[in-house]
Amino acid sequence: MTAIYLNLTMAFSLALMGVLVYRSHLMSTLLCLEGMMLSLFILMTLLITHYRMSSISMLPLTLLVFSACEAAIGLALLVKMFTSYGNDHVQNLNLLKC
């Protein structure tokens, strides 16, 4: 069972490294964030079933809902940036502009 936990931890770490390395493009950052959320979801589900913690069994589903909302908002932002600027560079994204 520890090999599964190690693989999921490595998947999370690689996705985090992907966010840090490919942070210039929004699409790459969103894909790496989804990888992080998916590995957290699987790891949390395995830990809850392994330790039989039924009191927090809804937590992975809540994480999955928030990651779906994050993906929807990220893709909407990506479409808006692409129609406005023609590319997905994060440097074009300025939160001070309305």
From Swiss-Prot:
| A GO term from the CC aspect | respiratory chain complex I
GO molecular function per UniProt: NADH dehydrogenase (ubiquinone) activity
Tell me which InterPro entries the record gives: NADH_UbQ_OxRdtase_chain4L/K, NUOK/Mnh_C1-like
Quote the Gene3D superfamilies the UniProt record gives: 1.10.287.3510
Known EC number: 7.1.1.2
Membrane-crossing residue ranges in chain numbering: 1-21, 29-49, 59-79
Q: What biological processes does GO assign it? A: ATP synthesis coupled electron transport
Which leading EC class covers this enzyme? translocase
Instruction: Provide this UniProt record's keywords sorted from A to Z.
Output: Electron transport, Membrane, Mitochondrion, Mitochondrion inner membrane, NAD, Respiratory chain, Translocase, Transmembrane, Transmembrane helix, Transport, Ubiquinone
Membrane topology note: Multi-pass membrane protein
**Family per UniProt?**
Belongs to the complex I subunit 4L family.
* Record function comment: Core subunit of the mitochondrial membrane respiratory chain NADH dehydrogenase (Complex I) which catalyzes electron transfer from NADH through the respiratory chain, using ubiquinone as an electron acceptor. Part of the enzyme membrane arm which is embedded in the lipid bilayer and involved in proton translocation.
Q: What is the designated name of this protein?
A: NADH-ubiquinone oxidoreductase chain 4L
Give the source species. Answer: Notoryctes typhlops (Southern marsupial mole)
Q: What is the lineage of its organism?
A: Eukaryota, Metazoa, Chordata, Craniata, Vertebrata
GN (gene name): MT-ND4L
